[in-house]
């Protein structure tokens, strides 16, 4: 088997996400939270494994020659599927047993007759790379936002567009997005990814309170808090996006707001479409030359 640290970066990323999943699911089961475990597994399989890893690696799977790159892709996918079968066995016992036996009997990699006889997976800390996970999440978020804007304007992905602008909140975010800019360009079919200082003023942020989260948390103080949120400056909005929380003073009390407590959007610029999610804003140039 090819060592994980000798496989391509995208293989190392999905293995890192897999081991993060193992830790989370183990904790959910220990807390008697099977619903949270199921959601975590579902998100991993749909968003990370299927929509991202398998799709980006499809040319590696299709290769005619059985070289190391193709072997690494198959070994990585196999590890993910067998591990998912083991993680899901307590909540989907029959299907996961079938999946496990189909995978292991064909390869002879494990001697257990059933997934329910196999050991529950253990997280390997050396395989977890949080910086790589964060970097790839930026690529996923930007790509998802741009593709949603294309869909909104009914501009097909095969139609190249000139550029996408992304305001960055700090040097770390700039470095992470720069590292995956080629991947973003290939995914959304744009020629340029332009990173802006978030304080440049090109994009004007708007903010409004999220009453669904504020109401249960703050009750009668919600009115004062929502009024304060609506008066936030651009600097306060940027700090909230950068730090994922912001402390404000309401009637002599310190209140900590999170990104879940607000809805942040950006004003559209003529000839551009703007969207944001997870603290990332994109502006897509929709001019077709």
What are the residue ranges of the model-derived segments?
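Feature 926 captures the class I aminoacyl-tRNA synthetase adenylation module centered on the KMSKS loop
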Residues: 1-289
